Amino acid sequence: VNEINRKQIGRIGLSMAINYFTCQGYTVSLPLNDTQWYDLIIEKDGILKTVQCKATQTESGEISLRNTGGTKGAVYDNIINHSELDFLFCVNKNLDMWCIPVKDILKAGNRNRIVLQNTPTVNNQGFQTYKYQVQILDKA
């Protein structure tokens, strides 16, 4: 992928999430503004779930749990402030995807960041994100 800016990276995460959940048979709804703590609402069998989308272009695959914005990139919120959020959908620079229940992030005690992994960490230490990796063809 060529050099892209933060806005484009965010659009990649959002569009990949829409594609994934649509292929899983969900109805995907987008809010009219961007002031809420979720990016998508997904519905299947009458059950609504909220999704926050994050994407990274870093080599490490690090995803910040903090939301930043404005002209100076100031932190204005944190995913962990919203225990009612259902899923964190993440995309890395290789367009690999993860769908992580936020309750699992909270249970693990992560407060600022997670690292997207395709395999377990050495000694299985830390939050094991590889368990939540998904593909378009997965069954929901």
Segments from the language model and where they lie:
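Mixed-charge (Asp/Glu-Lys/Arg
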Residues: 1-36, 41-140
